[in-house]
Amino acid sequence: ELPTIPLPFLMFIMIGFVLVIDLLGLAVTGLFLPFMELFTFNITNATALEWIFAVGFMVFTQPVGEEMIFRGVLFPLMRARLGAVGGLVANAAAYALFHLVLYTSQIGAVDPRALIWYGLIAPFLDGLILACVRAYTQSTSAAIVAHVVFGLFAIVKLFVITG
């Protein structure tokens, strides 16, 4: 039986991972950009309702929806079919391709390096980390909590970028 991870400790670990991925993105692209989901969000002109929707999307809707699909349904199927490592990699690749298709138009015009990093590599790393959380804890709920941390970080980063 695997040891359980207290959720506050898991959240703390996820802050470290998201910081490392974000700093790698800055090193690779030379650009400090908001997360793709918030790329077109205008912080200065946003209404209270737009803020509620943005925060709700980043810390509830997206983490729950994506984790239920990618880690709750697809990951067990991929792991059963491809083995432990193959399932992790295939799940992360599917997650990355989903994000690439969904957000390419928003970030592609900025810089080709940004498109490759923020559109494919960073989502792959995020997906790999989230799949590892799911595999280690055997809990989709833990993956949702980890994803919530990514969403909270995205909101904080948006504030940092826009001052």
Please place each PLM-identified region on the residue numbering.
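Transmembrane helix-loop-helix hairpins at the membrane interface
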Residues: L19-L26, F35-F39, A48-G163
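Interfacial transmembrane-helix boundary/kink motif in multi-pass membrane proteins
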Residues: E1-L24, I43, A80-G83
